[in-house]
């Protein structure tokens, strides 16, 4: 499996689904509501309800759950570090001791809470990029940030920068995979030896990768300049964004679901 197939962050999966057909602003706002609401969960047992909600949205989007969960792969080391940090260094009632290592009940609680929360955060954010094209993301973010233009905030430029950054992730992964295969075909040993040897072996990969990134950035700049791109001033859209009944229904159902999950935790807990 190539690197681009292992990591889905920033990739768009086209499909004919109710989630894909929603206005990008609806999906962005719904994702923000979900992400902020996840920080209100205090008991890891209640993440089960959030997992069911994620699975239901994935079912509606017609994107495989495996593809969505692959978006967690880039933060796997951060996930392991976060879980170990809370499990080993949270003070409380010790339930396991090994020399100077102590694992407390409160530490396991916090490790489970932070670990599952991080997985759900990345999964919901990854689902947004999987079901929304880069152009739709740019238009949606620009529209949501447009009120800030009154205070001279560059809403269009900011949205364009974020979209280009997201779009470059799959490109970087594809180029990295191509360079790795080329180096391996020449007999390069990229996985053998210790850490220092592996870092040295990756130097022939990083140098051409940086050159390709700069070349891609220059090509993009020339393409935008040749099309007389001057920013968001006077820019029109081939498909103007419009709120539909489905968008209001989706926002309402999402808000009710999030409020219901938070209320259930408070009522039971």
Curated annotation (Swiss-Prot):
<dbReference type="InterPro" id="IPR003339">
    <property type="entry name" value="ABC/ECF_trnsptr_transmembrane"/>
</dbReference>
<keyword id="KW-1003">Cell membrane</keyword>
<protein>
    <recommendedName>
        <fullName>Energy-coupling factor transporter transmembrane protein EcfT</fullName>
    </recommendedName>
</protein>
<feature type="transmembrane region" description="Helical">
    <location>
        <begin position="153"/>
        <end position="173"/>
    </location>
</feature>
<dbReference type="GO" id="GO:0022857">
    <property type="term" value="F:transmembrane transporter activity"/>
</dbReference>
<feature type="transmembrane region" description="Helical">
    <location>
        <begin position="75"/>
        <end position="95"/>
    </location>
</feature>
<dbReference type="Pfam" id="PF02361">
    <property type="entry name" value="CbiQ"/>
</dbReference>
<feature type="transmembrane region" description="Helical">
    <location>
        <begin position="45"/>
        <end position="65"/>
    </location>
</feature>
<keyword id="KW-0812">Transmembrane</keyword>
<keyword id="KW-0472">Membrane</keyword>
<comment type="subunit">
    <text>Forms a stable energy-coupling factor (ECF) transporter complex composed of 2 membrane-embedded substrate-binding proteins (S component), 2 ATP-binding proteins (A component) and 2 transmembrane proteins (T component). May be able to interact with more than 1 S component at a time.</text>
</comment>
<feature type="transmembrane region" description="Helical">
    <location>
        <begin position="110"/>
        <end position="130"/>
    </location>
</feature>
<dbReference type="InterPro" id="IPR024919">
    <property type="entry name" value="EcfT"/>
</dbReference>
<comment type="function">
    <text>Transmembrane (T) component of an energy-coupling factor (ECF) ABC-transporter complex. Unlike classic ABC transporters this ECF transporter provides the energy necessary to transport a number of different substrates.</text>
</comment>
<dbReference type="GO" id="GO:0005886">
    <property type="term" value="C:plasma membrane"/>
</dbReference>
<keyword id="KW-1133">Transmembrane helix</keyword>
<keyword id="KW-0813">Transport</keyword>
<dbReference type="InterPro" id="IPR051611">
    <property type="entry name" value="ECF_transporter_component"/>
</dbReference>
<feature type="transmembrane region" description="Helical">
    <location>
        <begin position="244"/>
        <end position="264"/>
    </location>
</feature>
<comment type="similarity">
    <text>Belongs to the energy-coupling factor EcfT family.</text>
</comment>
<feature type="transmembrane region" description="Helical">
    <location>
        <begin position="202"/>
        <end position="222"/>
    </location>
</feature>
């Amino acid at each position: 499996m190539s690197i681009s197939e292992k990591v889905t962050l920033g990739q768009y999966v086209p499909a004919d689904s109710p989630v894909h057909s929603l206005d990008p602003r609806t999906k962005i706002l719904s994702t923000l509501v979900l992400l902020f609401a996840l920080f209100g969960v205090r008991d890891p047992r209640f993440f089960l309800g959030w997992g069911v909600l994620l699975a239901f949205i994935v079912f509606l989007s017609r994107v495989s759950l495996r593809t969505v969960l692959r978006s967690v792969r880039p933060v796997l080391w951060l996930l392991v570090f976060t879980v170990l940090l809370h499990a080993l260094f949270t003070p409380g009632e010790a339930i396991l001791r090994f020399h100077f290592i102590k694992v407390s009940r409160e530490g396991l609680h916090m490790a489970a809470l932070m670990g599952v929360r991080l997985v759900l955060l990345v999964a919901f954010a990854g689902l947004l990029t999987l079901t929304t094209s880069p152009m739709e993301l740019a238009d949606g973010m620009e529209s949501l940030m447009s009120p800030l233009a009154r205070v001279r905030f560059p809403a269009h430029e900011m949205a364009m920068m974020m979209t280009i950054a997201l779009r470059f992730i799959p490109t970087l992964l594809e180029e990295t995979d191509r360079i790795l295969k080329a180096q391996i075909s020449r007999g390069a040993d990229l996985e053998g030896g210790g850490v220092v040897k592996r870092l040295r072996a990756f130097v022939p990969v990083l140098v051409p990768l940086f050159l390709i990134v700069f070349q891609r950035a220059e090509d993009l700049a020339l393409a935008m300049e040749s099309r007389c791109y001057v920013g968001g001033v006077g820019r029109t859209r081939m498909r103007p964004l419009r709120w539909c009944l489905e968008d209001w229904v989706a926002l309402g159902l999402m808000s009710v679901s999030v409020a219901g999950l938070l209320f259930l935790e408070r009522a039971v807990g």
